[in-house]
């Protein structure tokens, strides 16, 4: 298996991308193609003492996509960028999956253009995993599609449910529709129509649909898959991230207030470290673009080498899972005539 890594994508690239990709090749024994400026990639490998790791191939690309580039046009304007070259390699079958911490919009555009959507899937969706009260919850869509149809929400539910089952190991994932109330009469016309489609799929045993869930219920573990349009999902995701940072800052302020509270912190430091670890995204690695015919993983823009390594691990698991074939087998239940 060969995993393509965009070595120049992300806030901490090329160091984190090259380092993480090389660590993944060493740890998981799969071949990793590092796409970027050869001399820069080689220098990072040398600095980290990873030049001799087996399974690493440097693929030349002399430009890069930055976070301010127009997602819709950048891959055409910058054909020699690391992301564009990475997608060309994926399309040509030179690699089995792609990992990038680069521009999210450009990555989704490239995934659709070069990877292609699975036949019958209307739109690809970004599906990050977030911590919740009883483990993890997958949010789908988290920003790829700001405007959706009810059929798209139905497809997001199937895609994320299959991923949660086959890659995350969740048995009969509970699917909830993010809404402004739990009653089946709640929501705007889109949510009401989507609810009817999801309930039908649940009644037929195709999905484990648990009904509407409010935004506050998502981090409390009300479902394993939270289905929403990309606008709602992105707001939900950023709100949870903001609350986590706020809590961390406030707790630190309380413990640093006096000598007594500082001593108290020393007594519960282990517990605080465990609390922070719950929100550690490095161990998750990245979020998949679901509905695409080839695995594409979006690592966080600020990913360090551990996050990139785990994004590669997730790409390997995705490739081995048979999920894309499972989507094709179930596509008849995801379409509305």
Feature annotation, model-predicted:
Residues 1-42:
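N-terminal phosphate-binding or glycine-rich loops at protein starts, especially the Walker A/P-loop
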Residues 3-15, 144-154, 298-303:
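Short, glycine-rich nucleotide/cofactor-binding loops
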Residues 6, 35-36, 59, 100-102, ...:
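Short beta-strand segments
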Residues 49-95:
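Phosphate/nucleotide-donor binding subsite
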Residues 89-108, 186, 191-193, 197, ...:
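Glycine-rich phosphate-binding loop
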């Amino acid at each position: 298996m060969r995993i393509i890594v965009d070595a120049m994508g992300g806030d901490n690239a090329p160091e984190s991308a090259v380092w993480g990709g090389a660590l993944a090749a060493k740890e998981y024994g799969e071949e990793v193609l590092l796409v970027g400026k050869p001399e820069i990639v080689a220098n990072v490998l040398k600095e980290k003492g990873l030049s001799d790791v087996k399974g690493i191939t440097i693929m030349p690309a002399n430009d890069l996509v930055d976070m301010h580039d127009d997602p819709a046009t950048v891959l055409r304007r910058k054909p020699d960028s690391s992301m564009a070259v990475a997608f060309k390699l994926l399309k040509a079958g030179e690699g089995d999956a792609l990992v990038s911490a680069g521009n999210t919009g450009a990555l989704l555009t490239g995934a659709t253009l070069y990877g292609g959507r699975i036949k019958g899937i209307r739109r690809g969706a970004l599906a990050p995993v977030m911590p919740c009260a009883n483990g993890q919850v997958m949010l789908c869509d988290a920003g790829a599609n700001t405007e959706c149809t009810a059929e798209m929400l139905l497809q997001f539910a199937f895609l994320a449910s299959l991923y949660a089952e086959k890659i995350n190991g969740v048995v009969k994932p509970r699917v909830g529709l993010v809404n402004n109330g739990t009653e089946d009469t709640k929501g705007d016309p889109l949510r009401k129509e989507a609810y009817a489609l999801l309930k039908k799929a649940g009644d037929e045993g195709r999905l484990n649909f648990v009904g509407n869930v409010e935004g506050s219920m998502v981090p409390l573990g009300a479902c394993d898959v939270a289905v929403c349009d990309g606008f709602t999902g992105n707001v939900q995701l950023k709100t949870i991230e903001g609350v986590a940072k706020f809590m961390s800052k406030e707790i630190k302020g309380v413990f640093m207030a006096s000598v007594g509270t500082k001593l108290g912190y020393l007594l519960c430091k282990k517990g605080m470290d465990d609390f922070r670890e719950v929100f550690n995204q490095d161990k998750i690695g990245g979020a998949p673009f679901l509905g695409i015919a080839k695995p594409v993983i979006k690592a966080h823009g600020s990913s360090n080498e551990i996050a990139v390594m785990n994004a590669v691990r997730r790409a390997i698991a995705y490739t081995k899972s048979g999920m894309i074939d499972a989507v094709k087998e179930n596509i008849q239940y995801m379409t509305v005539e």
